[in-house]
A protein has these predicted regions:
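Short intrinsically disordered terminal tails
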Residues: 1-2, 87-89
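Acidic, low-complexity, intrinsically disordered interaction modules
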Residues: 14-76
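Amphipathic, interaction-prone secondary-structure segments
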Residues: 2-19
C-alpha cells in the first residue's frame, strides 16, 4: 500500500501503533502518539516537521517519510488525513 498511515496493532503491548511508509513501517511509542494527538491541530507544515522529527528518529527514516510523502500524491492532503487519523487512535 502506498502512502503514509498510522495503524493500531493492539493494546497493552510495548508498541501499540505503527506508522506505515509505503511498504515499510516503524513502531510508534504511546508517548509519541499522545504528543502527536496533542499537536494535531497545528498547520500542516508544522505538523509535518513534528511528525518527521518524532517518528523519523534516524536520518534514514526521515528520508523515507519525505520520499513517500512526495510519491503518494498531494502532500497537504496526506498530512491533513494523518492529522485526523492520529486523533482517532
Amino acid at each position: 500500500m502506498k502512502g503514509l498511515r498510522f495503524e493500531r496493532i493492539g493494546t497493552n503491548r510495548y508498541y501499540n501503533v505503527v506508522f506505515h511508509m509505503g511498504s515499510s513501517y516503524v513502531p510508534v511509542s504511546d508517548d509519541t502518539v499522545e504528543e502527536l494527538k496533542a499537536q494535531s491541530l497545528l498547520p500542516v507544515e508544522r505538523f509535518l516537521e513534528l511528525l518527521v522529527d518524532r517518528v523519523g528518529y534516524s536520518s534514514y527514516l526521515k528520508h523515507q517519510i519525505r520520499t513517500e510523502l512526495k510519491s503518494s500524491g498531494d502532500p497537504v492532503t496526506q498530512i491533513t488525513v494523518l492529522q485526523g487519523a492520529i486523533r482517532e487512535l
